[in-house]
Amino acid sequence: MSRTRRFSGTRPGRSMAALAVVLVGLGGACQMFDQDDEPARTTPERPPGSRSEQPDATESPGAGEGIDLREAEVPDDHPIEHVVFIVKENRTYDNYFARYPGGEGTRTGQTSDGRTVELSVAPDVQEPDLGHSFFDGIIAINGGRMDGYDQILNGEDLAGYNSFTRKGIPNYWAYADNFVLGDHHFSSMYGPTFPEHLYTVGGQAADVVGNKLQTNAPGGYCDDPGETVYRFINMTKKEQNEVMRAERRVDLDTVGNFWEEVRACFDFEVIQDQLTANDISWHYYADEGSWMNALLAIKHMRFSKHWGRDITEEEQFMEDITSENLDEVTWVVPGPGVNEHPGGPSVCMGENWTVDHVNAIMRSKYWKSTVIFITWDDFGGFYDHVPPPQTDHMGLGPRSPLLVISPWAKQGFVDDTVTEPSSVLALIEEIHGLDCLTHRDCNASNLAQVFDFDQPASAPKDRKLILEERSCEGLPARISAQYEKHGDDAFRALGD
């Protein structure tokens, strides 16, 4: 099935005169270009992850002139033998770390009518869910102004203009105090969940721009021939440049006119293919049928020997740690109830899940050779004030937090290097000598800058940070009762 969609946007595009779009640069530097002018162009090192010709990137980090974010290298004698990539849901950097000392945060936000408002203290349970679709991301960014968060779904009352304090997420802040916090880590695209997760395994999303259109059940993807998604049509370079300009001026009609409806099952190369070809063990832990299970939408993975062996339910991760069966590269995708998705799940319970899993790794024999990356897949409708680079027609999207936890990570280090989820793929490729997959991971920072391999041999023992899980008292009665009765299954009906 492939139906070209001539789209009429549900939200009108804003009329904008020529204006300067500010794109953040390394170390806080900025570059500017007029929206109606053709920006400077560069060509990536390798072909893009798309059926289209390679788009021309705007003058921005990760694609800008003279910037090579992959020049940092991990030494050949590095001690990293295990990479654990934990992908949670729907938070921005400013939502979790706007108040964190030393980071690129803010206490205020900008609204579409020109006001400056104080960011309120974030609630543990955010209800209702906030808009975080592809269009919502474009609207929120508003051509780099970062003032459209009150124009997205359920954002009218400034519901997304809030941030946590240390008291609200003490253990995440403790990890930042003792390891690495990335404050210029951007989500892969404007949103939402499903295609964002595709980037975590493939450095691309097959140009998909939304979750499946059938919302009556969790994702079946390659198991369900009736499930469809919208994605960009196969575009020429000229058409991609037209789309990118339309995104900057929030012309949703023009952007949507390049979409088509296709089946939600794809067959592009993922990094697991390269790991398998090079005899590097890997495991992808995600609940079958979950909205977030990216490999369920990759045909040659879903119908392969890997399914049920290397791709299993999330809860098996803890069993494998206990039985000393951790693979070299691991993805862990928590399910509803503990993934911190707005609209029901508790951040406190989600943070406890993270602490439980990180503690298990620290107590295991693997800690001395492991790096853990924790990030959140998309912006979730929450405010963030730093304009993302526009590297192609998919994004980047607003910032999301990145925590790097390892005995070999720098201590209390705030990394201002521009990164994205493909940066984790770039590190895996650097460590194991693999080829990159798309222009995203080819050009992304490989995160080598967050490590200190000159630490003494006792570092793994000295740098364990076993944290206590918190009591999640004070939750709304409905949420508390559901969780007490059903545990992690309490929120599955809510979906993601």
Where are these regions (language model features)?
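N-terminal secretory signal peptides that target proteins for export/translocation
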Residues: 1-11
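Sec-dependent N-terminal signal peptides
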Residues: 11-23
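C-terminal motif of bacterial Sec signal peptides marking the signal peptidase cleavage site
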Residues: 26-29
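N-terminal pro-sequences and low-complexity stem/linker regions of secreted or lumenal proteins
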Residues: 31-34, 38-496
